[in-house]
A protein has these predicted regions:
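Cleavable N-terminal export/targeting peptides
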Residues: 1-27
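Short glycine/proline- and aromatic-enriched beta-strand/turn motifs that initiate or cap beta-hairpins
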Residues: 17-78, 86
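Outer-envelope beta-barrel architecture signal
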Residues: 24-32, 69-77, 114-122, 162-172
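Transmembrane beta-strands of outer-membrane beta-barrel pores
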Residues: 36-42, 81-87, 124-132, 157-159, ...
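Extracellular loop and loop/strand-boundary signature of outer-membrane beta-barrel proteins
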Residues: 42-50, 86-94, 136-142
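Residues that define the transmembrane beta-barrel architecture of outer-membrane proteins
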Residues: 50-58, 94-102, 116, 141-151
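Residues on the lipid-exposed face of transmembrane beta-strands in outer-membrane beta-barrel proteins
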Residues: 58-66, 100-108, 122, 151-157, ...
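Outer-membrane beta-barrel transmembrane domain signature
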Residues: 138-176
């Protein structure tokens, strides 16, 4: 039995090498953003006041061509994580907030010119998070959940400056 198992394990990679793999080698475009900045939070369930402060964000975007429609449809996903610490105007109370946002979209590619790509598609987005107010005793926190469906369009223009490649991209999403 051990010999049979060993022969099988040696045979599987050889069979896999015989596959006719016609996958096109597409790159995955990925970008990650780390940010720190000012936040304004107003949740009338917790307080009628606007809380201001600072927060941190990590945003990751991945874009990849798929096999759909003869490799003319790309998949784009965003993952965004936010944390914020804010205080009321009198600085007598503070709040903490945290959100996770995920978006998944598919775009069909049109190429009217060699340097210009136009993309059209749709995306779905989901957000979950919380706001915790340190001053409230009875209802100290509120949960946030959102989902939406969006129409999405993108334009990508590629050019060179002194033999350095550049790309300009503009994207718009409209909730339906």
């Amino acid at each position: 039995i051990t010999l049979l198992l060993l022969a099988f394990l040696c045979l599987v990679p050889a069979l896999r090498a015989q596959e006719n793999n016609e996958d096109k080698p597409w790159s995955v475009n990925e970008a990650t953003l780390f940010g720190v900045g000012g936040y304004n939070i107003k949740d009338t369930y917790l307080s009628p006041l606007k809380y201001s402060g600072w927060g941190m964000r990590i945003l990751n975007e991945r874009m990849k061509m798929t096999r759909l429609s003869d490799y003319r449809i790309s998949r784009q996903q965003f993952i965004n994580v936010d944390f914020a610490f804010t205080r009321n105007p009198a600085e007598t109370a503070s709040s903490f907030a945290g959100f996770v946002d995920y978006s998944l979209g598919y775009h069909y590619h049109f190429q009217p010119q060699p340097a210009l790509k136009l993309l059209a598609g749709a995306s779905v987005r989901a957000l979950g998070g919380f706001i915790y107010n340190t001053r409230n005793g009875n209802n100290p926190a509120s949960a946030k959940v959102e989902t939406d469906l969006n129409l999405s369009a993108m334009a990508i223009y590629k050019f060179q400056v002194n033999n350095y490649p550049f790309a300009l991209r503009y994207q718009i999403e409209i909730p339906v």
